Amino acid sequence: MGHLTGLGSAVCKLSKMFFRLGICLSLLFPCIATSGQEIAITMKSGLVLEGLAGTIDEISVTLERPDAFGQKQIVLMDNGLTRTYVSKRDIANKGDSSLSSTELDIWQRTAGGQKGHGILLDIGPFDEHGHRTIWVRDTTNRRVPIVQGITKLNPKWVEVEALVNPNGGNRNWTMRLATSSLPPNVLRNMLHRTINDPKNAVQRMEVVEFYVEAEQYRRAIEELTQIERDLPDARDNFKQDRQRLRQQYGRNVLDEIRFRDSVGQRELARAMAGAIDVADMAGQLQADFLDFQQQSIATEKRIENAKKELIGRCQKYIAAHDDQPAQQDALQQLIEEVGSDLRPTNLNRLSSYARLINDNTKTEGQLLSLALSGWIMGSSNVTENFAESESLFLVRNLVSEYLAPAPSARRVQILKELEKYELSQPVHLSAILFNLLPPQAPELGDLYKPGDVKYTGEHPLEFEVTVKGPKAHGGKPIKFNYLVHLPPQYDPYRKYPLLLTLRSGNSVEEQLERWAGQYNPKLGLRGIRNGPAMRHGYIVASLDWKQEGQSIYEYSAREHKAILSCMRAMLRKFSIDSDRVFLTGHGFGAEAAYDVAISHPDQFAGVVGIAGKIGKYPNQYFDNQHLGLNVYSVVGEKDLLSISASANCWNKWLNGRLFNRCMVVEYQGRLTESFREEFGNILNWCDLQRRKWPAFGEPVSIDCELLRPWDNYYWFIEYHGLPLQNQVLPAAWPANGRGFNSINISAKMPRDNTFLNVKPAKAGGGITIWLAPEYIDFTKKVSVAPRGGGFKDFVKPSREILLEDVRKRADRKRPFWAKIDLN
């Protein structure tokens, strides 16, 4: 945290916060004091957590005293607001913590009595006294209003307690909320209640220091300005403090500008940089702002120069080669696309061309072939052979038509036409697919171009997916609607992360706005919403996955199809990095998210469950052996239903050597809530996660239990015809959750990536092994046993298999090139 100099630094000596560290995951015991250290830990992913640290054996409803970062495997980090549980094996290093020790007491008439328990129904706003009303359904099923008041302030958290009820029936409802979640006027009023003498500069500066430690620098400057107005005689004493505040505020803004630029919001970042007055900032900070602006200008100039040079070279070649109409047509199309679409996100496609542009040993045709092939296939897949590359636009157009999608008969024709072109082999098609714009993109205009915008961000985009209904109801198609918001300055040439979110009892619109935020027309830029997902540059889709009247998650094929179909539709419509797809949900939307992601871990970079339980099938699949799934769970301390249902999976993942990487965040004293204050932390975590995928030269081991016919594929192994005696459908789920006659599918591949051990050897209708160059060497024979009777042969990549795989799975980043069908 920053600290003030001058008068402010001499007076801000506030009480050391008394931390408590404990499990507090049940109603059976209170928080437990511990001898834990206040430290910062850095996870292997790069995520940093701070707080008092201790270790425990397991998350449990039984009493356990944490060790002070001892030998136990589950590490607990208490920062006063939350307790975060991580696995010791996932920690890279630890260091000193910078958490603030400031704690201010606010007097309120608090209630005593036993701890209150119930289900949260509604939350009212805070008034000017720091009071709010929550409504809970108590153990007698009554709707009970409870008035709470703010009693403690810390730069990271505030504590609220139940106030005295004059009608009796007092209960202790103590909760911790994020300080950042308080409305600014409420926080200011509470801080000013700690001031006994408004003319006392020492007391007034304590408020400024609080804002600084809370990293609310604009509020700190506003508070200091008010102090200077109220105490003009002491104004000169604050000069050094004001300068330091301006520096901290400016550095904070610059960090935000750079972050926005890094997630693809260049226009917004430039507007922010141009709007701030740097005149009274120190020289280095001024230089940093100037450097950012100059880099932006230099990038634009580099793009304009690249356009001018390449277009000029193309035009000269066209004029001099009337005998090459195919090359002329290709270059004319290149001129149009480069002139219209060249930008920072695709400039690297021309890097091979730019690197050799002054090489006198290259002919004009070779150089233009480098530019053309780089533009369509990427700079790492270029060719100097213009006779081959001249057909690339034709090949790309056929691929786009195939995925449009074309009718079945036309797809057969396209495959035949592709055979004519040298650069239509699977290796070339894979490169084209990766660099292809979304094949079913909606008509948005180009958010990157002023005056060409049909989506402004004010209203969501609306779509629907259709899935086949259950046979019991005649297989009638069922439609599911979903809403989409795009991040500011969405650019189809950039690959974005996707957040697919599932509602609970709220509306699909409300679920979308939780992540995307509200529209801000005052910013004057296209597509600006103020939600955390927009800030981080995520595309957000909110799926109305439930049928009318549905009040619980049913673990059905219909629900899985709806969610996975929505994800694939998004991959077809928008420019999405398929290694950065996250499934999240609230309440029983979280229950759905856990089930779908844990059953299909190869589809997602991570799953985020908020105030929901890990239920039936995931509790059977928790020890499936595979490449791993990243799991982020958020619960309230008093949400015992979610905790008791999920603890088995959490403990196995945190404590054992299993394959899912898990983090559990528990909000102190809280019930079943939306936990919006956690969204920024969730997205910080998402930023660091990627989908796990087999890699060449690394051993792969998959061994997964199957209970439902639609849980039949993991990465590259797909099982067909799950025997009836091995199925446990949702309607037949045993009451005790036991007695399963499940079957496992497995595929093990050593480092040489030429042999696959595939099981079961006989049961079921067959197994398909899907192959890709990331983990298979197609120049060597592939052996498979015991399934398939000892298959050993070369496997040839196929255009049809590749394009059909992309048409069905919509994953243009990691398509399969070939397959082996085993009876």
Regions found by a protein language model. Name each.
Residues 35-333, 337:
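Compositionally biased alpha-helical segments
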Residues 304-496, 805-807, 811:
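A domain-start/cap signature at the N-terminus of enzymes
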Residues 494-505:
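Short beta-strand element of the alpha/beta-hydrolase
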Residues 553-574:
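Alpha/beta-hydrolase active-site loop
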Residues 579-625:
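Primarily recognizes the serine-hydrolase "nucleophile elbow" in alpha/beta-hydrolase
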Residues 633-635:
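Short beta-strand/loop motif that positions the catalytic acidic residue
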Residues 640, 644-754, 762:
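C-terminal catalytic histidine-bearing segment of alpha/beta-hydrolase fold enzymes
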Residues 708-751, 755-823:
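C-terminal beta-sandwich/jelly-roll accessory domains of carbohydrate-active enzymes
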